[in-house]
Structure formats: C-alpha cells, structure tokens
Curated annotation (Swiss-Prot):
Keywords: Cell cycle, Cytoplasm, DNA replication, Nucleus, Phosphoprotein. Interacts with rad4. GO terms for cellular component: cytoplasm; DNA replication preinitiation complex; nuclear replication fork; nucleus. The gene is drc1. Phosphorylated by cdc2 at the onset of S-phase. The modification Phosphothreonine is found at T60, T74, T99, T154. Gene3D superfamilies: 1.10.10.1460. The modification Phosphoserine is found at S87, S183. This is DNA replication regulator sld2. Disulfide bonds: none annotated. Changing T60A: Decrease in phosphorylation by cdc2; no interaction with rad4. GO terms for molecular function: DNA replication origin binding; single-stranded DNA binding. Residues 270-285 have a biased composition (Acidic residues). The keyword Metal-binding does not apply.
Length: 337
C-alpha cells in the first residue's frame, strides 16, 4: 500500500512539472534551465520532492531472512558466539588464587615465608654457579658422547673374558707387544702416495726410451711409403699426361672417298689414232700368231688395262675425247640417316 501511494504522488508531481515546462516553452520558446528553476522556489521544491521519491522507489527492499530447518542437515560443531569487537581475555595467574598451603615452596612472595613461616634471607639459598664453567662442562660431555658414537663397532659373538692380572714373569715384553684394533678407524684418511718431481721425470724418460725406437721406425716406414706413392704418381702423370679435349659440337658423318672426275691422269698419255690402232692390232695379231707366246699377250693387256689413278681402272683409249672407266667395288655402304 505504501508503494502505491508513493507512485501516485510521483505521477501527480510529474504532471505539475510537465505542465509548467510546457507553459515556459510556449512563452519563452526555449526549455527552462536550472537558473530559471531556482528563480521560482515553488517549482524548485516540487523538483526536490520528485527526485527524493524517485530515489526511494529505486531502492529495492532487503529480503527477510528465512529460518533454516536443521532437521535435514548434518550436525555441526557449535562454537561460542563472540562479538567481533571483543578482545581475547588475558590468561589468569593461578598463583594468585591458590591458598598458602598449596603454594610451591620455591615461590617467595614480597615477604619471604614458607607455609606461613617467615624465612631468613640467607636460608635455603644455594650459591650462584658460574655460567661459563657450566657451558664448558656441557661441551665436554657432548664431545665425549659424539666421539664414542662416531666409530662404529660390531658386537663380537664370543666376548673376551674379563682380563685378570697376570704375574710379571708370564707377561710379554713391551718390545714384542702389538696393538690390535678391533675395528678400522674410519675417520683416518690414508694419504695418497706422493712422488717427487725427479722421480716422475725419470719414469717419463724410461718410458720414452722404451717406446721411442718403435715410434721412429713407424715414422720412417710412413715417410718411405709416402715418398714411393708420390714418385709413382709423378711417373704416371709424366707417362700419361691428361689432356683436355674440346667436346665435339657437330655430328660425325662418315663420307665415302671423293671421286676426282678431272681428266688430269690422261694428260701424260700419248694420243692414239684409230688407223694406227688398227694397224697395231693387225701387227699384234701377226706377231702373236708368229711368236705364239700367251705370256707376252697377258703382260701387254695388264699394262694397257691396269693404270690406277684415284681408284679408277682405265682401259684402252678409244679416242681423244672418250676413255672407258671401271669403278671398283665399295667396301661399305652408306646408310641413310
């Protein structure tokens, strides 16, 4: 109900303010500013009321806490409720609340008394010990305990019997006595075996003498092998020098021998007339019939036929402008590419 009355009041004040704003715009042709509102106190009061009511309505009311039913929850530890500003209490001194009978005898109050009996100041008082002496004795006691526990000793299976005093006649002389340790002294560190510089140099020289000869032999063999290999390489280079050839840039084609068709081979031959040739033939026939020697005929034919020039066989010359040729057989044939 309170909210409804507030909303009604806000709407009524808003209507009055809007009415005044419209009138002001109609008369002055501009909206009112803050200074114009302050000049009219009634309108300023209405604005103030309007903004206060608006702010109160915008605040949301807090929700009321609802009580939780603890029947359906696990039990929790109940802590004592203490206020936040409450400081913790100081611890109480129990000696102030104790009766004199139960008071510790070592406790002395303002007046020295023990079980309601006044004490003398020098009674039951122990002398003050020096703190420095106590510290030294504690240190010695601790070091003795540490030294006894540092050396580990194993328990012996057959414990030695209690030593009894033997007569001096049966005792071993002191020169032959040896001290036997039951357990090794782990704290003692054996010093490493040290050598002098001269001994180390002597050992190095002995090692060099032993192994130096072998090294020299190996070096000589290696040098001889390297020199022989270099000489062989030099000889091979001299005997077979490497030459860089230009790569062939044209196609290799094998052609047959060129035929020289010029008649230069006929220049040295004598001219033969047909009449003389016929007459020579007649004479040859008569001489052949007379001599009847076939060997001479074959020899004359070879002389006439086998005149070789530029691969051509020349026969008998018929005339000055004509000569017979016989081509030799070719040894290879040109393949077409």
């Amino acid at each position: 109900m309170h909210d409804e009355s507030r909303t009604k009041q806000i709407s009524s004040i808003k209507a009055l303010l809007k009415k005044w704003e419209h009138e002001y715009v109609h008369t002055n042709n501009c909206k009112p500013s803050k200074e114009d509102v302050k000049k009219q106190p009634e309108i300023a009061l209405l604005y103030k009321q309007y903004y206060e009511l608006k702010r109160e309505s915008s605040i949301t009311p807090k929700k009321a806490k609802t009580k939780v039913d603890f029947k359906f929850q696990t039990p929790t530890k109940q802590r004592a409720e203490t206020e936040a500003n409450e400081s913790p209490k100081a611890p109480r001194n129990d000696y102030l609340q104790v009766t004199p009978k139960t008071v510790d005898k070592s406790l002395l109050g303002p007046t020295p008394q023990l079980s309601r009996r006044v004490l003398n100041l020098l009674e039951d008082m122990s002398p003050i010990a020096d703190s420095h002496v106590d510290q030294i004795s504690d240190i010695k006691h601790n070091t003795s305990e540490i030294s006894s526990t540092m050396i580990p000793t194993t328990p012996s299976k057959n414990p030695e019997p209690v030593a009894q005093h033997t007569p001096t006649v049966l005792e071993t002389p002191s020169s032959y006595r040896l001290q036997v340790y039951t357990s090794p002294n782990l704290l003692r560190v054996n010093a490493p075996c040290r050598k002098s510089l001269s001994e180390m140099l002597r050992e190095l020289k002995d090692i060099e003498d032993d192994y130096g000869s072998n090294e020299e032999k190996i070096l000589q063999e290696f040098e001889s092998f390297s020199s022989s290999s270099s000489e062989s390489l030099v000889d091979r280079d001299i005997s077979q020098p490497m030459k860089k050839k230009i790569k062939r840039q044209n196609r290799l084609v094998k052609l047959p021998p060129s035929m020289n068709l010029s008649k230069s081979h006929l220049e040295g031959l004598p001219e033969i007339d047909e009449d003389a040739e016929n007459g020579i033939d007649d004479n040859e026939d008569t001489t052949a019939s007379k001599d009847s020697s076939p060997f001479l005929d074959l020899q004359s034919e070879r002389q006439n036929k086998k005149i070789m020039r530029n691969g051509l066989v020349i026969g008998k010359q018929v005339s000055q402008n004509y000569s017979s040729y016989k081509l030799k057989k070719r040894k290879f044939r040109r393949h077409r590419s």
